[in-house]
Amino acid sequence: MNINRDKIVQLVDTDTIENLTSALSQRLIADQLRLTTAESCTGGKLASALCAAEDTPKFYGAGFVTFTDQAKMKILSVSQQSLERYSAVSEKVAAEMATGAIERADADVSIAITGYGGPEGGEDGTPAGTVWFAWHIKGQNYTAVMHFAGDCETVLALAVRFALAQLLQLLL
């Protein structure tokens, strides 16, 4: 389910990665939920942020970095048909990554991120800074696409912040 535009969180300066991971860890622990992650363009930055939070083992057990199509298929069971038809940077593939991570990690909640951090976009003309997200919560996938501006590191940091902030919103 694509998240309605009015339900998309707007990042503010106080939404630092540290503040977001702290709030998210508290929410997940209170709700007794286990989180897993599936990352492509962010290359483990989301997992790294989560592992820096207090009490990480109480809410986070595994994360997957699947940069290539082959890795997405082998590790997360993303279908070759989806990759060929929609590309790795698509709503369909993000949703399959989120579902695959849940199944592999035996978790309750997942975050998946796939996109083009830069400096180049996709061969299909998708611009750099385009990032698809999926969150799998209680059997339901939620998806969103964002178009971030900036250099690669800025785009990736914004992607991590957005993924965390939106999950917090979805769990409320």
UniProtKB/Swiss-Prot annotation:
Protein name per UniProt: Protein YdeJ
Function: Does not have nicotinamide-nucleotide (NMN) amidohydrolase activity.
One Pfam short name: CinA
Residue stretches in coiled coil: none
InterPro entries assigned: CinA-like_C, CinA_C
Family stated for the protein in its record: Belongs to the CinA family.
Gene symbol of the encoding locus: ydeJ
Matches recorded under Gene3D superfamilies: CinA-like (3.90.950.20)
